[in-house]
UniProtKB/Swiss-Prot annotation:
Signal peptide: none annotated. GO terms for cellular component: host cell endoplasmic reticulum membrane; host cell Golgi membrane; host cell plasma membrane; membrane; viral envelope; virion membrane. This is Pre-glycoprotein polyprotein GP complex. One of its GO terms (biological process) is receptor-mediated endocytosis of virus by host cell. It comes from Cupixi mammarenavirus (isolate Rat/Brasil/BeAn 119303/1970). The record marks K33 as: Important for GP-C-mediated membrane fusion. A lipid is attached at G2 (N-myristoyl glycine). Gene3D superfamilies: 6.10.140.1590, Arenavirus glycoprotein, zinc binding domain.
């Protein structure tokens, strides 16, 4: 009833469009011709029954939806931050930046070549050991803070200085248990696992030394932006206690220069994913602006904020990197840090903000809001683990598309007009078939012309009594 009322209200509007006029003409012709066919068929009551019976339509979904994924990299955004990667279970590398040719190796082993009796004891200043190399100084500071080393309470760090005859410096952390309640070894081991990922650990032959030395970067392992995020999160505790809740962090969108744009914009492909995959533009950003409870939205805001921050920095010095670090630490919410820490401690699948999956409609190109591809035991889950979730997401995507299409159609063409056109076409097709088939409408005397008024009964006589009972054979005739 509501559709009928809205239809009459929109009569002056829909005739302005050619499509609506064509639909109206087709509807009118189909109805008139259908009524004529119905009249000629001789079975009006049956036709009305066929029209009124079984007016239902089913719509199946899933034919044009596919399960797809993409991988993010932030090398172009965090190009000034160290990049971590693991070569094997005992050898790790920290690249000074994403564009640097220098690196810091972190070895976890059972032997150490640096002795405190012959070397220097590090108390927070690395200049004497690194040869006043500012790049290595701040990288060492980041790594040691990421390992949660406390210079005031933890065992001392020994180093072998960089000399003219020896271009290599070495730092050594002794993880030997000093007393029964000493948890320094477990703390460093947990921090290494958090920074570089899980590694094989033999309880019978434990590693008791961590050695760090300068080296060169020659693509020994594959970098991932997850490592940079882990290092940022590990260093976040240093500024966490001194910062308060700020009101400037909101979910409003802006352009590349920082100008507020509530409607959102399309992020560049190079910043998110490779050009051959998919650029998530206004659609995904608009969804994040309305509902920002997913990891994908967190990463988009993190990318966007740091892109603006990096473009406003004047140089690539240590002060600029520290400023960026504090900005990122302020950006990452306490809930985000706590959630990932708890998931790691509970050993349940967690999000590493690297790979995301989404449901894509192959015909229209519309897609759902990407969700994180979970990781468990250092490896991505199988596609089958997301089956129920992505089927449900597919249903939501179809429902959203149908709702959007309904609103657009109702705005341009009244839905009732489309329904009338459809059912009138069904009506015309049905009556045309009945007209072609035809139904017997009266009796004839076999082998003779039809007598008027030719309404004969089964005895061959007219029902009105004009003719006598002829008792001749009768046949049914169709009247066309």
């Amino acid at each position: 009833m509501g559709q009928l009322v809205s239809f009459f209200q929109e009569i002056p509007v829909f005739f302005q469009e050619a499509l609506n006029i064509a639909l109206a003409v087709v509807t009118l012709l189909a109805i008139v011709k259908g009524v004529l066919n119905l009249w000629k068929s001789g079975l009006f009551q049956l036709l009305m029954f066929l029209i009124l019976a079984g007016r239902s339509c089913s719509f199946r979904i899933g034919y044009h939806t596919s399960f797809e994924s993409f991988t993010m990299t932030i090398g172009g955004v965090f190009h000034e931050l160290p990049a971590l990667c693991k070569v094997n279970d005992t050898y790790n590398l920290v690249r000074l930046s994403h564009n640097s040719s220098l690196a810091l190796s972190v070895e976890y082993g059972d032997t150490g070549t640096v002795m405190c009796e012959h070397g220097h004891v590090v108390s927070g200043n690395y200049t004497e050991c690194t040869g006043a190399s500012e790049e290595y100084n701040w990288v060492l500071d980041w790594v040691l803070r990421g390992l949660q080393h406390d210079f005031s309470r933890d065992p001392v760090i020994c180093c072998e200085p960089k000399k003219k005859t020896n271009a290599e410096f070495q730092f050594r952390l002794n993880l030997t248990q000093r007393h029964k309640g000493d948890h320094y070894q477990n703390k460093i081991k947990t921090a290494l696992t958090h920074l570089f990922g899980p590694f094989a650990y033999n309880e019978k032959d434990p590693k008791i030394f961590v050695t760090m030395r300068n080296t060169t970067w020659t693509n020994q392992c594959v970098m991932s932006h997850t490592d940079s995020l882990r290092l940022l999160a590990s260093n976040g505790g240093n500024s966490f206690s001194g910062r308060g809740l700020k009101a400037f962090f909101s979910w409003s969108l802006s352009d590349s220069t920082g100008v507020d744009m509530p409607g959102g914009y399309c992020l560049e492909k190079w910043m998110l994913i490779a050009s051959e995959l998919k650029c998530f533009g206004n659609t995904a950003l608009a969804k994040c602006n309305l509902k920002h409870d997913s990891e994908f939205c967190d990463m988009i805001k993190l990318f966007d904020f740091n892109k603006n921050a990096i473009s406003k920095l004047n140089n690539n010095t240590i002060e600029a990197v520290n400023q960026l670090t504090k900005t990122v630490n302020s950006l990452i919410s306490d809930n985000l840090l706590m959630k990932n820490r708890l998931r790691e401690l509970l050993k349940v699948p967690y999000c590493n903000y690297t790979r995301f999956w989404y449901v894509n409609h192959t015909r229209t190109g519309e897609h759902s809001l990407p969700k994180c591809w979970l990781v468990n035991n250092g490896s991505y889950l199988n596609e089958s683990d997301f089956r129920n979730e992505w089927i449900l997401e597919s249903d939501h995507l179809i429902s959203e598309m149908l709702s959007k299409e309904y609103q657009e159609r109702q705005g341009r063409t009244p839905l009732t007009l489309v329904d009338l056109c459809f059912w009138s076409a069904v009506f015309y097709t049905t009556t045309l078939f009945l007209h072609l088939v035809g139904f017997p409408t009266h009796r004839h005397i076999s082998g003779e012309p039809c007598p008027l008024p030719h309404r004969l009964n089964r005895h061959g006589a007219c029902n009105c009594g004009r003719f006598k009972r002829l008792k001749k054979p009768l046949v049914w005739y169709k009247h066309h």
